[in-house]
Amino acid sequence: MEIKDIIVKSDFINLTNQEIDKIIKILDIELNDKEDPRQRLFDNIDLIFKDNKAKDVLLSKIFAGRKSVKWFKIIYVGNDNIENYKDLLIKKIESDEYCFDKIKSINNKSLESPSLYTCIKLDDNKYIMRFMIPCGTKTYNDGQDYSKFKNINNVVVIVDLNCEYLEIRTNSKDATRIANQLMDTFKAMYVSIRDLDVLKNYNGSLEKFKSSLYNGNFAQSLSIPDKNLKLTEENNELLVNMLIVIDDYFGDKDIKKFNDKVQALNIDTDGTPFTELLLAGMASIGLKIRKDCEEDLSKQTLYNVLKKYITNYSGLIKFSDSPVGEIYTISVGLKTLSIFFKSSVSEKTIKYIRQKVL
């Protein structure tokens, strides 16, 4: 089997309209007015693979696009006999149990857990697996009646035994379900799978990660306060009055009046920094850069004042995969240890980010 044998019609959703049009133009295909171009290309997939230009466009996006990606580290339990463990794992993967070079029929209606249905070899000790996984139900309303149906995701999993990682292209929750299922069989070969921290090379810092990327720009953050502080109504009012006093000073520059007002407030902070008190009662803090702002979030005053007292939960980073390339946006999940490509990206872009996080 080859890669074209495991492509399904829904994969064509990953291609943008421009990419669909490009393939149609390369192959000189004429469409009827009401014809679905993605259906037409799927029906002519053999024709696409006979044309190198069309095939390159297809393969750059067919499993990419707008995707959540989560990586896992493949760990051999003992440092001795690693090659033997790897050989055992290869034999396991290249077996009927892993649907190697075959496609297993899946009954979607009865599907309750991730189900591996095909696996092929991409390169030396590198494989691509596909899983069907149920992800809730959807309701269809036709204006008079409604019906519910099970929603199924078709997930791509890359297994690279040389670089020792799993790359699962779906949300963190489903990726973990798939990884756990693989772990159940991998552990028999003295192999374990662990979450890979996408910021491990950057000491957990979104700012350092951003700086490692071409044209990196820290555009947005969602954070949580480090301490769960509570204020009385009286102390809350005193804090508000303190801010008013500071504002007044910037207006009249009267330092004596400023000192008198501060002493009159007599706020008892019990050693807690003023900025940290301002975060009392907050569950999360979201900061976002204006579109016309040239400098990113890490250069903004408010972020730099707060960052000592908050922990980033997630962040948006804009970047390029080359010095003068197109700008893409990713959402980095520090709790989920995953990356969501908010822009429609190619395999080249996913590879660029992969090399940064492994």
Stretches with model-predicted labels:
Residues 1-358:
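Intrinsically disordered, low-complexity, charge-rich terminal extensions
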